[in-house]
Amino acid sequence: MKQFSAKYALILLATAGQALAASTQGISEDLYNRLVEMATISQAAYADLCNIPSTIIKGEKIYNAQTDINGWILRDDTSKEIITVFRGTGSDTNLQLDTNYTLTPFDTLPQCNDCEVHGGYYIGWISVQDQVESLVKQQASQYPDYALTVTGHSLGASMAALTAAQLSATYDNVRLYTFGEPRSGNQAFASYMNDAFQVSSPETTQYFRVTHSNDGIPNLPPAEQGYAHGGVEYWSVDPYSAQNTFVCTGDEVQCCEAQGGQGVNDAHTTYFGMTSGACTW
């Protein structure tokens, strides 16, 4: 894993201090540990869920051969939650989905008025929708007092966002954690997500959109093509810590997106010191 230099870290922190008038620096250790836990699961999804927390029980796999969408249903009896995690880009087939920027009506969620979502990720979603809904229903029926958590990194983050949106129409206890999420839909979709996941305040939000340093993927697809982000952004700046995590609730270009990153870079593949699929944590 490549390490950021101390000089670069200071530059990022200085930039943050100048640009984030509508944001706050520092989160609680409990929330930080929660974000790290979800990042661990999301990064482990690239390597068949290696080194996930010991409290988590690995359940059924989600898979479609045509789209190469991979995911799992997990359960944590300690935290009382059912976790759906999606792997990020892992093949040329996934890359074809990544680069399909055509905004597409979110037809599987008609109550999301005027919502359009990333065309490639919508293809991915409908390829596994029946599996996901069936497996979640099975687990939720067996464990009715458990929360439903959805997470993922990169492509997996957008898959998580579409999944969480769909599940929120049926269940009222859905939480979403994404890492390096591309813009997943238009402003109507972002607004729907913000309403459904109580994003009006960091105290109420159930949509935690985590970014890192100058990760270039959250800048894609371009806003100029009709895309927008939802959620409360939690921007992690190196050296990563609870204190170096910014809560960004204003304009989405204040934090990660303002750093000028483009595409897949070191900041995208590594979150909280964990590199996608490396399993060295």
Curated annotation (Swiss-Prot):
It comes from Aspergillus niger (strain ATCC MYA-4892 / CBS 513.88 / FGSC A1513). The active site is at S154, D215, H268. Keywords: Carbohydrate metabolism, Disulfide bond, Glycoprotein, Hydrolase, Polysaccharide degradation, Secreted, Serine esterase, Signal, Xylan degradation. Its main location: secreted. GO terms for cellular component: extracellular region. It is found in: Secreted. This is Probable feruloyl esterase A. Disulfide bonds join C50-C279, C112-C115, C248-C255. Involved in degradation of plant cell walls. Hydrolyzes the feruloyl-arabinose ester bond in arabinoxylans, and the feruloyl-galactose ester bond in pectin. Glycans are attached at N100. GO terms for biological process: cell wall polysaccharide catabolic process; lipid metabolic process; polysaccharide catabolic process; xylan catabolic process. It catalyses: feruloyl-polysaccharide + H2O = ferulate + polysaccharide. Residues 1-21 form the signal peptide. The keyword Ligase does not apply. The lineage of its organism: Eukaryota, Fungi, Dikarya, Ascomycota, Pezizomycotina. One of its GO terms (molecular function) is feruloyl esterase activity. Substrate binds at D98, Y101, H268. Its EC number is 3.1.1.73. Belongs to the AB hydrolase superfamily. FaeA family.
